Swiss-Prot record:
It is found in: Cytoplasm. It comes from Lactiplantibacillus plantarum (strain ATCC BAA-793 / NCIMB 8826 / WCFS1) (Lactobacillus plantarum). ATP binds at residues 261-263, 348-351. The lineage of its organism: Bacteria, Bacillati, Bacillota, Bacilli, Lactobacillales. The gene is serS2. PROSITE patterns: AA_TRNA_LIGASE_II. Belongs to the class-II aminoacyl-tRNA synthetase family. Type-1 seryl-tRNA synthetase subfamily. Pathway: Aminoacyl-tRNA biosynthesis; selenocysteinyl-tRNA(Sec) biosynthesis; L-seryl-tRNA(Sec) from L-serine and tRNA(Sec): step 1/1. This is Serine--tRNA ligase 2. NCBIfam families: serS (TIGR00414).
């Protein structure tokens, strides 16, 4: 959440910056009008409370002097009733201000490309050369089905569209990938966490999914809980309403979890394969840092994700997303996109974002600076990586003409020495 005081003091700047993210200037004006009304109500209430205290003193004095205080008592009762009315109105307006502020996205960093179009993203670097095939490469879903390691038909039978079974070496490959990821992150100083897969509305609010994207979530209505769309939610909320000791910063967390996505608005897109599912595994990285360190930590976070693709030998590039394409909470996002030969293009496999103090302000996560003053931490998150998409990229990039798939060298130990996936019996 943005600081309402900051918006009040810099309205034109905020309108310009959030305008780059598609926010109408009238939304800022409406927020400021409500904020002004709230402040007026507070001032009136405080003035009446001062009057009430003064009259209370007069009543006490008259009673000590055994004088008639009925007029003052009547006045104090009226003032108290007015204070109650004003405070109730203030609470209503305050809720309106908070709701308006909760729907505003984070301010973009000055280096973020200004555009509402995703195709205007800026490429930072390109690593690896796409493999030249002596045969026509197949799509990963065809490879997986031909080998008997991915079963989309039975997944749809049991759960509906955008679900599948990993079978045999398919399940082993998925497990090999995420264990490799977790081991690499642990070596980089991340603490592994096994988080809850269902969270409260307050947790979803803290990381910015609620209230704006509530319709996109899978809800457990009987318990008023939500299936997590990413492990970012429980990891960031680990420190909700807490003060992190400054000497502990930065804190690095990593977690494997399923991600549950409604994928509203994706009808007709990526209807086959592992790219867009309602349930998929993902290894997440989350950082809590001091504000002055967060931009360096974003580069480290991105490098952590990149190192996985390098070790897997998968061609990829890194892009900086535009102001209109970043996630709601991000001030800057670097996307890693891996090469898919059958599609002849790069597809997203990781998003690494600096959310500055946006989530920390919503979730009340703070630390004490050198002067002992409470400050909000900065939070960062990144996929490290999306497991299913990594499996898909391996199947396509390491496929052989005979239909088998060579296992990347770094995964062979995780596959108990197996170097190739062949058709299942």
């Amino acid at each position: 959440m943005l600081d309402v005081k900051m918006i009040r003091q810099n309205p034109d700047f905020v309108k310009e910056q959030l305008g780059h993210r598609g926010v109408a200037a009238s939304d800022i004006d409406d927020l400021l009008a409500a904020d002004e009304k709230r402040r007026e109500l507070i001032a009136k209430s405080e003035q009446l409370k001062s009057t009430r205290n003064q009259v209370s003193g007069e009543i006490s004095q008259k009673k000590r002097n055994k004088e008639d205080a009925s007029a003052e008592i009547a006045e104090m009762q009226k003032v108290s009733a007015d204070v109650k009315t004003l405070d109730e109105e203030r609470r209503t307006v305050d809720a309106q201000v908070q709701d308006m502020a909760a729907h505003l996205p984070n301010m973009p960093h000055p280096d973020v490309p200004v555009s509402l179009k995703e195709e205007d993203a800026v490429e930072l670097r390109r690593i690896g050369t796409p493999r030249h095939f002596d045969f026509t490469p197949k799509a990963h879903w065809d490879i997986g089905e031909d080998l008997g390691i991915l079963d989309f038909e039975r997944g749809a039978k049991v759960s509906g569209s955008r679900f599948l079974y990993y079978v045999g070496d398919g399940a082993k490959l998925e497990r090999a990938v995420y264990n490799f990821f977790l081991d690499q992150h642990e070596a980089e100083g991340y603490t592994e966490v096994l988080p809850p897969y269902m969270v409260t509305d307050e947790s979803m609010y803290g990381t910015g999914q609620f209230p704006k994207f509530k319709e996109d979530a899978f809800r457990i209505t009987t318990q008023d809980l939500t299936l997590i769309p990413t492990a970012e939610v429980p990891l960031v909320n680990y420190y909700r309403d807490e003060v992190i000791p400054a000497e502990k910063l930065p804190v690095y967390f990593t977690a494997l979890s399923p991600a549950f996505r409604e994928e509203a608005g994706s009808a007709g897109r990526d209807t086959k394969g592992l790219i867009r599912l309602h349930q998929f595994n993902k290894v997440e990285m989350v950082k809590f840092t001091k504000p002055e360190d967060s931009w360096d930590e974003l580069e480290k976070l991105t490098n952590n994700a990149e190192s996985l693709l390098k070790k897997l030998g998968l061609p990829y590039h890194v892009i900086t997303l535009t102001t209109g394409d970043m996630s709601f909470t991000a001030a800057m996002t670097h996307d890693l996109e891996v090469w898919f030969p059958e599609q002849d293009k790069y597809r997203e496999i990781s998003s690494c974002s600096n959310c500055t103090d946006f989530q920390a302000r919503r979730a009340h996560i703070q630390y004490r600076d050198d002067d002992g003053k409470l400050q909000f931490v900065h939070t960062l998150n990144g996929s490290g990586l999306a497991v299913g998409r990594t499996v898909a990229a391996i199947l396509e990039n390491y496929q052989n003409e005979d239909g088998t798939v060579t296992i990347p060298d770094v995964l062979v130990p995780y596959m108990h020495g197996k170097t190739k996936i062949e058709k299942q019996g």
